[in-house]
Amino acid sequence: MDGTVTPSPITTAMPPVSALDAGTPTLPPEAPLAMPEQNLREGSLQVRHQRTSPPGIGVRRFYLIGGTFATTAIAVWVMLSVLWPDGISVLEGCLLGLFVLLFAWIAMSFASAVAGFVTVVARAGRKLGIDPEQPLPTLRSRTALLMPTYNEDPRRLLAGLQAIYESVAETGQLEHFDFFVLSDTTREHIGRAEELVYNALCDRVGGHGRIFYRRRADNAARKAGNVADWVRRFGGSYPQMLILDADSVMTGDTIVRLVAGMENNPDVGLIQTLPAVVNGQTLFARMQQFGGRVYGPIIAFGVAWWHGAESNYWGHNAIIRTQAFADHAGLPSLRGRKPFGGHVLSHDFVEAALMRRGGWAMHMVPYLQGSYEEGPPTLTDLLIRDRRWCQGNLQHAKVVGAKGLHWISRMHMLIGIGHYFTAPMWGLLMLIGIGIPLAGGDIDLAGDLPFSPARYWHGSSQGNAIWIFVCTMFVLLAPKLLGYIALLLNPRELRACGGAFRAAVSILLETVLAALMAPVVMYLQSRGVFEVLAGKDSGWDAQVRDDGKLSWPALLRSYGGLTVFGLFMGAVAYAVSPALAAWMGPVIVGMALSIPVVALTSLRRTGMALRRAGIFCIPEELDPPKVLVRASELRRAAALEPSLI
C-alpha cells in the first residue's frame, strides 16, 4: 500500500478457480485485505474536526438549523393565529403537529437551496485542490474501477465500460488503472453471455491483464457484499477504488482528477461526484434529467456547503480509499427479520457514516463535471426502485443510534427516513384540513352549501390561511426558481438548455407534470411505508435501463385501483359541494388521470417530439462529451447484434 505503480499482471495461465466464483473468472493474483464487521453498539468518533473541513463550517450549520427554526417559527405563529381564536381541538392539534414537521422539512430544503444558489452564482465551493480548469495532474498510485452488475444486458453494460476505458486511455495514464466487472448475476444464461462479451471486449481494446471479470457463486448481501468480496480478495493492490453503477459513464479527465484528489489528501476517505442524468428519451426520463440539470446543482451545492467533510455516499460515481473502507465499512447483519433485519440494503449511507466514525473525511465535489448516469424511463420504474430505497432508508432506524457516529451522519439517515414519512404526513394534513370544518359543528351542510374548506379557513382567520398556503408553495418551489435564475446568469448553460423562453416553458411543464404525478407518488410511497412497517420485503430485481414500454394491462394493474379511488373521492366531494371538489381537484385529478399520465410520460415519441421543439434540453445533448458519444455509439451497435439473453 505504498502507492507505487506496478504493471497490471498479464496472466498466461488461468489461476485456480475459487469456490467463491461461478463460471470462468479472469482475475489478477489475490491481495487480501481484512475487512472486519463493525460493531454498532460499540465505538467512538476518532476525529472530531477534519483538516479538510471548510472554514466556518459551524457557522454554516448554524445558518441551516437556525434558518430552518426561524422560518418554521414564523409559519407556526401565523398558523396559530388561524387555529387559536376559538381554542385548539384535538384535530387542530394534530394539524398543527403535522404542519410544524412538514414546514420544517421544506424550510430546511429552502435554506440549503439558498446556500447552494449563492455558491453556484459565486462559482465557489471548490476544494481538495481539485480544479477542472488546471492541467491534468500526473498520478502516482493504482486505482481499481469496479462495475458491479446484476442480471443486466452484458452488451449494454460493457459498452459503457469500454467508453470509460478508452477515455482513461486518452489521458495517457491508463497504466495506473485496472477495471473489474463484478457480477452478481443469478441467471445462468446471462452469466455465460457476460463471459462472452467480456472476452470480446478485452480482444477489442487489448484489455487482457487490465480488465477483469468474476461472478460470485453466492450473491449474499447484494451490492455491498459484492464490493466487500472484492476488497477482501484484491483490495491490497489498490490504494483507491472507484465505484460505478451499471449505467455509469465517467470521463477519464474526471477520474484522474479524483485519484489525484485522494493522493493529495491522505486523510480523505471518499469523494462523491454529482452524476448528471443523461440519455433520457421518454417524456418522464427527459423531465427528470432536465430537473436534475437545472435544479440539481442548486440542491447539491447547498448540501455540500454544509456537509463539509461529513458528506454522504450515494453508492456509485465516487472514489473511495480502499484501506479506510476495509477498516471501517464492514457491514454487520442487523438483528431481527426482514424488512428491518438482515443485510443492510441502503448500504452507502451506513458505509459513509462508519468511515467518518473511523476518522476519515468524506467530501462531495458537485462542481466536477464528467460524471453521468441514466434515470428510470417511467414513473413505474422509478417507484419500483423507490420501494427498495424506502425499505433501505427505514432500515436505518436500526443504525442511526450506533455508537460514535458524527451527528451529521445521523442527520443524513434521519433525513432519509423522514423523506418517506413525509408522504403519508402530507396526505394526513390534507384530510385533517378537510375534516376540521366538517367535524367542528359550525358548518350546516344543508344551509352553507356550497361548502369549501378554503372559504372556511379564510373566514376564520382574516386571510392568514391564504398567506400560509402562499408561503408554503413559495418555499416548496423556491429551488426551481433559484435554479432558473442561476441558469439565466450562465449564458452558456442557458443556450444549451434551449434559451430563456424554452427553459421557462420546460420548468413550467415539469412543474405541472410533477404536480399531476405527486398524488400517485404520495399514495405509493405511503403504501410502501406501511408495507415495510407490516414486514413486507421489497426483493431485488434488475433495473430497466431503456424505454419503459408499458402495456395497458400493466398500467391497469398498477394504477387501476388508484384511479377508481380518485374517481370515488371526486364523486363524494362533489356530492358534498362542487367547491369542495374543486378545492381537492389537484389530488383528485392526479389520481383519476394516473393511467393516461403515466402512459403519456412513458412514451419515447412524446419525449423526442419535445426535444425537437427544444423543451427539456440539457447541455449534454447540444454538445455531448466524447465519452457519452462513444458510449451511445457502442450501445447502438450492441443493440444491432443478435440477442444473447
Curated annotation (Swiss-Prot):
It comes from the Bacteria. One of its GO terms (molecular function) is hexosyltransferase activity. Residues 1-21 are annotated as: Disordered. Residues 1-11 have a biased composition (Polar residues). The chain crosses the membrane at residues 62-84, 99-121, 417-439, 466-488, 554-576, 581-603. It is found in: Cell inner membrane. Keywords: Cell inner membrane, Cell membrane, Glycosyltransferase, Membrane, Transferase, Transmembrane, Transmembrane helix. InterPro entries: Glucans_biosynth_gluTrFase_H, Glyco_trans_2-like, Glycosyltr_2/OpgH_subfam, Nucleotide-diphossugar_trans. It is a multi-pass membrane protein. Pfam families: Glyco_trans_2_3 (PF13632). Pathway: Glycan metabolism; osmoregulated periplasmic glucan (OPG) biosynthesis. Its EC number is 2.4.1.-. One of its GO terms (biological process) is glucan biosynthetic process. GO terms for cellular component: plasma membrane. Involved in the biosynthesis of osmoregulated periplasmic glucans (OPGs). NCBIfam families: PRK05454.1-4, PRK05454.2-1, PRK05454.2-5. Belongs to the glycosyltransferase 2 family. OpgH subfamily. This is Glucans biosynthesis glucosyltransferase H. The lineage of its organism: Bacteria, Pseudomonadati, Pseudomonadota, Gammaproteobacteria, Lysobacterales. The gene is opgH.
